[in-house]
C-alpha cells in the first residue's frame, strides 16, 4: 500500500497562499480568508435552503449552506449581507463569486484553496492519476483512508446502494470510463452516477466517508426506483438496465465486461438411446448468475451457529457445468463467460411472511481463485448479509421479521489484502475467514 507522506496543507497555509495570489488585484478577495472547508458538504441535495429550488444554486463557502441566485434580493445576496459571508461557488458552473459585489473570482485555477474545493465538488482525473490507485490518502482532519475503499454514512437505510456502487466502481473498464470522461452532455442520471464513482476514488476527500442519500433520493423521485423489498441484487440489476438505457458507451462496456450467456435445454434420458434434447433450446443473456443453496431448516432457539451447514461453491456451480442425471431435466450450459462474473446466492423466499428470519443460512465455502470450464477467475468482491434484530416494544419477544444489513468486502490488488466496508468503518479481513458470513453477491474477474 503506497503511503502519501505529503499531508494536506493547513487551512492557514492555503488561505495565506490564496490571499497572496490575488489580494493585490482586488481588495475584496481578502474574504477568501473566511472560507471554511470543513463545513462544506457537496454530497447533500443541491437545493436552496430558503426556496427549496434546485435552480441556480450556490454554496456559501463560509457556512456550507446552499442558496439560490446571485442577483440583488436573491437568497444568496441577502445571506451575504446578513451574515457577512462573501465567497460562493456556483454548483453547476463551478465558478467562484464574491457577493454582494457580484464579482467573479478570476484565475481561480491558480489558487490551491479554490482548486481543492472545485475538486471536492467535481473530481477530475487523467490516465496517469489512475496508475497508482488505490493509495493511502488524508482528509482535512488528517485521518487516513484508501481511495476506492470508502465508507458511507446512513448505512441503516442505503447499505444496499453502497454495496452496488462499490461493486461497479471496482470493475476497472466501468470505473475508468467514469473517471476519465466528462458527462456534461449526458442525462442527469449518468451525470450523478459518474460523480458518485469519481468521489469514491477521490484522493482529496474533505471527510473520509461519503453520502449517497441525495443520489438514491433522486433515483426514487425522478428515475422510478420503486423496488420493495430491495436488496443489492435487485438494485444492481435495476442500475445495469438503467445505465444501458441511458448511455450507449456504457452499454457497450457493460455488455462486453459483465454480460454472460447460458443455454437452457430440456433433456430426456431414454434407456434405449443416448440422452436427447426435447422442446425448445434457448440462449439467455445474464448479468447475474443465481446459485441455488441446498434446502435449509431455520434453527430452533438454542441451536449453535457452529451447526450451520456448509457447501463448497464448486458444488453449486455443477448446475451450469454438468448435465443432470434425472430422467427428465433442464440442462444449463454456460456459452459465454464475461470478464466479471457475478454470482447471487439465493437465500430468501419472498413468499414467506418472514423472509429474513426464515432465510437460508447455509455458509458457502470458497477460495480466492476459481476455475469454470477451464477459465480461471479471481474473487474481487464479496457482499455479505447480516441480521439486525428488531427490538421489542412491549417487553415480549419480537414476532415480526428481522432486518437485513449489507457489508461489502473488496480485494486490494496492490496490498493483496481484503478490506471490509461496513457503514463508515473500513477494516482489514483475512481471506480465509470471508466465508464465515452469509455471502449474497460475489464478483469474480477473469484472469488472462
Curated annotation (Swiss-Prot):
Pfam families: UCH, zf-UBP. GO terms for biological process: mRNA splicing, via spliceosome; protein deubiquitination; spliceosomal complex assembly. It is found in: Nucleus. Keywords: Acetylation, Metal-binding, mRNA processing, mRNA splicing, Nucleus, Ribonucleoprotein, Spliceosome, Zinc, Zinc-finger. SUPFAM superfamilies: Cysteine proteinases (SSF54001), RING/U-box (SSF57850). InterPro entries: Papain-like_cys_pep_sf, Peptidase_C19_UCH, Ub_carboxyl-term_hydrolase, USP39, USP_dom, Znf_RING/FYVE/PHD, Znf_UBP. GO terms for molecular function: cysteine-type deubiquitinase activity; zinc ion binding. Residues 150-447 form the USP domain. Its main location: nucleus. A zinc finger (UBP-type) spans 27-124. It comes from the Eukaryota. The modification N-acetylmethionine is found at residue 1. Zn(2+) binds at residues 60, 63, 79, 85. GO terms for cellular component: nucleus; spliceosomal complex; U4/U6 x U5 tri-snRNP complex. Component of the 45S U1.U2.U4/U6.U5 penta-snRNP particle, a subcomplex of the spliceosome. Promotes the assembly of newly synthesized U4 snRNA into the U4/U6 snRNP particle. Required for splicing of pre-mRNA. Present with 167 molecules/cell in log phase SD medium. This is Pre-mRNA-splicing factor SAD1. The gene is SAD1.
Amino acid at each position: 500500500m503506497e503511503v502519501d507522506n505529503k499531508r494536506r496543507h493547513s487551512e492557514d497555509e492555503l488561505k495565506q497562499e490564496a490571499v497572496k495570489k490575488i489580494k493585490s488585484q482586488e481588495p475584496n478577495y481578502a474574504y477568501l480568508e473566511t472560507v471554511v472547508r470543513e463545513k462544506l458538504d457537496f454530497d447533500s441535495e443541491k437545493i436552496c435552503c430558503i426556496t427549496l429550488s434546485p435552480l441556480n444554486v450556490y454554496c456559501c463557502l463560509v457556512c456550507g449552506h446552499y442558496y439560490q441566485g446571485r442577483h440583488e434580493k436573491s437568497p444568496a445576496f441577502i445571506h451575504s449581507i446578513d451574515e457577512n459571508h462573501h465567497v460562493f461557488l456556483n454548483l453547476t458552473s463551478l465558478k467562484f463569486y464574491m457577493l454582494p459585489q457580484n464579482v467573479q473570482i478570476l484565475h481561480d485555477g491558480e489558487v490551491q484553496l479554490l482548486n481543492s474545493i472545485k475538486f471536492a465538488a467535481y473530481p477530475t482525473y487523467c490516465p496517469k492519476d489512475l496508475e497508482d490507485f488505490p493509495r493511502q490518502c488524508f482528509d482535512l482532519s488528517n485521518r487516513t483512508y484508501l481511495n476506492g475503499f470508502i465508507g458511507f454514512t446512513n448505512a441503516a437505510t442505503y447499505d444496499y446502494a453502497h454495496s452496488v456502487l462499490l461493486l461497479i466502481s471496482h470493475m476497472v473498464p466501468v470505473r475508468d470510463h467514469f473517471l476519465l470522461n466528462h458527462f456534461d452532455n449526458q442525462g442527469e442520471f449518468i451525470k450523478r452516477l459518474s460523480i458518485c464513482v469519481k468521489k469514491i476514488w477521490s484522493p482529496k476527500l474533505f471527510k473520509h466517508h461519503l453520502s449517497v442519500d441525495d443520489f438514491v433520493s433522486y433515483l426514487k423521485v425522478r428515475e422510478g426506483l420503486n423496488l420493495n423489498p430491495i436488496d443489492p441484487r435487485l438494485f444492481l440489476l435495476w442500475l445495469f438496465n438503467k445505465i444501458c438505457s441511458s448511455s450507449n458507451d456504457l452499454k457497450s462496456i457493460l455488455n462486453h465486461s459483465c454480460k454472460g450467456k447460458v443455454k437452457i435445454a430440456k433433456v430426456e434420458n431414454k434407456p434405449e438411446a443416448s440422452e436427447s434434447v426435447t422442446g425448445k433450446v434457448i440462449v439467455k443473456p445474464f448479468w447475474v448468475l443465481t446459485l441455488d443453496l441446498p434446502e435449509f431448516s431455520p434453527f430452533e432457539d438454542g441451536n449453535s451457529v457452529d451447526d450451520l451447514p456448509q457447501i463448497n461453491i464448486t458444488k453449486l456451480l455443477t448446475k451450469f457445468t454438468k448435465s443432470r442425471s434425472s430422467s427428465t431435466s433442464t440442462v444449463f450450459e454456460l456459452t459465454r463467460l464475461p470478464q466479471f462474473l457475478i454470482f447471487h446466492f439465493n437465500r430468501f423466499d419472498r413468499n414467506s411472511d418472514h423472509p429474513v428470519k426464515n432465510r437460508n443460512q447455509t455458509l458457502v465455502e470458497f477460495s480466492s481463485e476459481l476455475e469454470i470450464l477451464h477459465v480461471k477467475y479471481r474473487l474481487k468482491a464479496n457482499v455479505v448479509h447480516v441480521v439486525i434484530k428488531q427490538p421489542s416494544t412491549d417487553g415480549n419477544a419480537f414476532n415480526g421479521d428481522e432486518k437485513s444489513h449489507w457489508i461489502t468486502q473488496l480485494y486490494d490488488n496492490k496490498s493483496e489484502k481484503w478490506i471490509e466496508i461496513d457503514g463508515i468503518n473500513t477494516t482489514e479481513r483475512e481471506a480465509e475467514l470471508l466465508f464465515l458470513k452469509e455471502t449474497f453477491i460475489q464478483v469474480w474477474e477473469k484472469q488472462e
